[in-house]
Amino acid sequence: MKKVILILFILSIHLNIYSQINPDNIEIVRDHYGVPHIYADTDSEVAYGYAWAQAEDHFKLIQEAYLAGNGMLGKRIGLKAAGADFLTQFIQSESTVNDLYHTLDAKFISLLEAFTEGLNAFAKKHPDEVLEKKLFPITPKKILRYTQLQLFISN
């Protein structure tokens, strides 16, 4: 009986972490400064709502950043992006992220996945604002590649 209870407990935690996102449960309220405050039932829904709010504010900038982090900015702006695209290759961000991705905490990955769901849903609803179709769908690994580029440049 104790084993059954333990299994049910672990299963309930697992289901809570990997719960489905219901956009209807997410409320984005902006204060008088325009700062988004996201209200939702789960952390994943908050991450989804945060991504949506960020996209509402500066979807173009987000896309250009992720293009840079994934060695694709040159497709958008041409030779001016050669430096960023080179750095992405130089720091071997793709292989680094692929090699270390499995070491990340499952909860962190689930929040990254929820964030990407929010960005991808925004892109789907606003296809005319998508700069480079090959960037989509955005994945957690694409976000991490951009993060690695940011860290490299800032150090």
What are these regions (language model features)?
Residues 1-21:
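Bacterial Sec-dependent N-terminal signal peptides
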Residues 22-155:
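Substrate-recognition/specificity elements adjacent to catalytic centers across diverse enzyme folds
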